[in-house]
Regions:
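Negatively charged, low-complexity tracts enriched in Asp/Glu with abundant Ser/Thr
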Residues: 1-33
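Acidic, aromatic-enriched beta-alpha/helix-loop junctions
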Residues: 38-78
Length: 88
């Protein structure tokens, strides 16, 4: 991920409010849960597609390097695309 994409991803992730709520991605509805911990140093995000078995899961450590993204059991590109292209 280049610096511009990293910055955009970080910004979009921070803009998402903590809690659980519906979002849309590729015309599908997901229940997204976001939790910010350790005074903003760790962001946990999980989204479960409603009506199917797709999901998104990631941990993001904002203060490690330029931000360290750790997807859970899926490609980094999948979680980046989800965060950048979801709508609330």
């Amino acid at each position: 991920m280049n610096q511009k994409d990293r910055s955009l991803f970080h910004q979009k992730l921070l803009e998402l409010k903590d809690g659980s709520y519906d979002v849309f991605y590729e015309d599908k509805r997901y229940l997204l849960s976001k939790k910010t911990e350790l005074k903003g140093k760790l962001i946990k995000l999980y989204a479960d597609e409603l009506g199917d078995n797709d999901f998104i899961s990631l941990n993001y450590y904002s203060e490690i390097g330029d931000g360290l993204l750790k997807p859970c059991e899926m490609p980094q590109e999948k979680v980046i695309d989800f965060v950048l292209n979801l709508s609330t």
